[in-house]
């Protein structure tokens, strides 16, 4: 029984990650990660959890805006130089292990960088949200100074770390110099017996290269010979005792170095919790900075998120972030903005239009807009976008899972939609549902019936459902239920090309035959297809829709003309006002 329940729960939660994948949210996060400054920052951007409530989303947005403003005001921006990933180092030290000098220096560098960042960012008036994060962060200056005093660049333990270490190293250098002088004397004395005048090393011992057959001329220990046998490497007897003395000194130095590393590691271990908290706060700040820089790159604007479920969706000229990314890297400018204007009482929008017209892009755009706002990112659009905070975003786009499971397209859609319906029950809250080609993949009559029934169910259970479709009957739902609305991807009848613009309140025209003709389908097939349809009925519908489109264009053009006229009027008013004030001031000065 328990196993069955867990399996059912897993199926219901599966749709959450599946929907994110279908909307290509992981790719957006991957793009976000390129604006991070550290490896751990990049990992955070790629795998963060979306906020579970509105206040957390608002917190993230405030952090994004605060650090973005600061970053833009600095010539070289905010730097995270010196910040390191300390997770493994802290684990070693907290368990009583001994960290190497290089790792301990990373701790010191991170503490120094943290104090510098805290000083730069902390301002409870200008940056209250970030300051709240940093308020209780301890940067442990005494520990930083201890480690920096004892360690040189690269993590080498400095001579100054302890008097004993300094004395031992000086003594070792003195003995090494003594041994070198003795070996140089031997080279001068026995130069004729040597292959060269170089002091070499074998197995940690100093040796001289004697010619074969001459090594018995001097007492010593043979450590090696050349491959040809022509050279014998001998450590002269006179320096063997010195070498033994150096080995003992090296051992004492190693013991002292190990003692120092152990002491410092212990100090780090005692402060591991404090340091881990500091590193986590730095990661949150870097995450905020990454969001700010990505948002700036997108020319984004902050969205207003509403707690009220029945608030409007108002997003103007949204540019799909992945298309913006592709355009930038391909040096193009082809992204067509999409606008959404969904009234509070609307529950279902049916988008119709040609396959090549960008219906799926529009579907993904609103899904990504909701996710980006939820994650504290600015939206790549204009104006002041406003939308409800959505707890759930569920999507059925494409049939990737169907292919993986060897299911038909229709079966794949139905299974995913079933998971969406189950998830709405399990995860109550404001929900956005996105359905691509709803009811497709089966008999059109039954598919239409299923699509209509499904959208009516969604109207009762989700805040907003947006569905793309080819079924003409779905366009009629708005006339029997005020919660439904139509939208379409506009189509240029002159060029027989989709414009990729989303039009609200106008259903899409049937352009299948025109598109097929443009794509080069055999002319006889086109002629035969035209005979199978009722031309009068189709022409009437298309003429009505075309008339609506032209009326919309005229209204939009008139609105643009009115806006331009208003702008000119306001400018003229401002100029007249300035002129009047200037004349008045001159008159007052003259009277004085």
Model-flagged regions — what are they?
Residues 308-552, 557:
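ATPase nucleotide-binding head domains, primarily ABC-like/P-loop NTPase cores
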């Amino acid at each position: 029984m328990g196993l069955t329940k867990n399996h059912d729960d897993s199926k219901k939660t599966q749709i959450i990650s599946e929907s994110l994948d279908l909307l290509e949210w992981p790719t957006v996060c991957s793009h976000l990660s390129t604006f991070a400054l550290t490896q751990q920052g990049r990992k955070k951007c790629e795998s963060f959890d979306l906020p579970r409530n509105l206040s957390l989303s608002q917190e993230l947005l405030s952090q994004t805006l605060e650090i973005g403003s600061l970053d833009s005001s600095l010539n070289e921006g905010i730097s995270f130089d010196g910040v390191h990933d300390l997770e493994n180092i802290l684990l070693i030290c907290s368990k009583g292990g001994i960290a190497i000098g290089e790792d301990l220096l990373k701790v010191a560098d991170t503490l120094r960088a943290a104090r510098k960042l805290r000083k730069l960012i902390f301002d409870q008036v200008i940056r209250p949200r970030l300051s709240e994060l940093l308020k209780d962060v301890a940067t442990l200056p005494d520990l930083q100074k201890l480690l920096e005093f004892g360690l040189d660049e690269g993590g080498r333990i400095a001579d100054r770390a302890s008097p004993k270490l300094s004395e031992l190293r000086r003594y070792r250098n003195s003995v090494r110099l003594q041994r070198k002088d003795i070996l140089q004397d031997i080279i001068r004395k026995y130069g004729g017996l040597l292959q060269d005048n170089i002091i070499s090393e074998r197995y940690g011992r100093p040796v001289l290269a004697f010619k074969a057959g001459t090594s018995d001329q001097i007492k010593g220990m043979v450590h090696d010979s050349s491959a040809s046998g022509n050279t014998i490497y001998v450590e002269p007897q006179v320096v063997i005792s010195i070498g033994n003395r150096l080995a003992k000194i090296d051992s004492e130095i190693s013991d002292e170095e190990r003692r120092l590393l152990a002491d410092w590691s212990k100090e780090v271990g005692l402060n591991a919790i404090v340091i881990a908290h500091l590193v986590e706060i730095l990661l949150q700040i870097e995450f905020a900075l990454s969001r700010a820089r990505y948002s700036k790159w997108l020319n984004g604007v902050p969205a207003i998120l509403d707690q009220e479920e029945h608030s409007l969706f108002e997003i103007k000229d949204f540019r799909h972030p992945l298309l913006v990314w592709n355009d930038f890297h391909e040096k193009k400018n082809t992204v067509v903005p999409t606008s959404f204007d969904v009234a509070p009482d609307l529950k279902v929008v049916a988008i119709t239009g040609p396959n090549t017209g960008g219906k799926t892009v529009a579907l993904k755009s609103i899904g990504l807009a909701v996710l980006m706002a939820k994650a504290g990112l600015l939206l790549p659009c204009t104006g002041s976008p406003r939308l409800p905070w959505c707890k759930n975003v569920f999507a059925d786009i494409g049939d990737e899972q169907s292919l993986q499971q060897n299911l038909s397209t229709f079966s794949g859609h139905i299974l995913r939609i079933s998971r969406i319906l189950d998830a709405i029950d399990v995860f109550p809250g404001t929900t956005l549902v996105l359905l691509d080609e709803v009811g497709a993949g089966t008999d059109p009559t039954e598919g239409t019936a299923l699509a209509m029934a499904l959208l009516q169910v969604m109207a009762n259970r989700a805040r907003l459902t947006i569905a793309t479709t080819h079924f003409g009957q779905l366009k009629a739902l708005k006339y029997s239920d005020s919660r439904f609305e139509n939208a379409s991807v506009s189509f240029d009848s002159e060029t027989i090309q989709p414009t990729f613009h989303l039009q609200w309140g106008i259903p899409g025209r049937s352009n299948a035959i025109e598109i097929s003709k443009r794509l080069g389908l055999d002319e006889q097939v086109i002629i035969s297809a035209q005979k199978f349809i009722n031309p009068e009925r189709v022409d009437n519908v298309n003429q009505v829709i075309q008339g609506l489109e032209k009326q919309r264009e005229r209204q939009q053009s008139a609105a643009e003309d009115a806006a331009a006229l208003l702008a000119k009027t306001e400018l003229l008013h401002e100029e007249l006002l300035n002129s009047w004030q200037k004349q008045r001031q001159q008159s007052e000065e003259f009277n004085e």
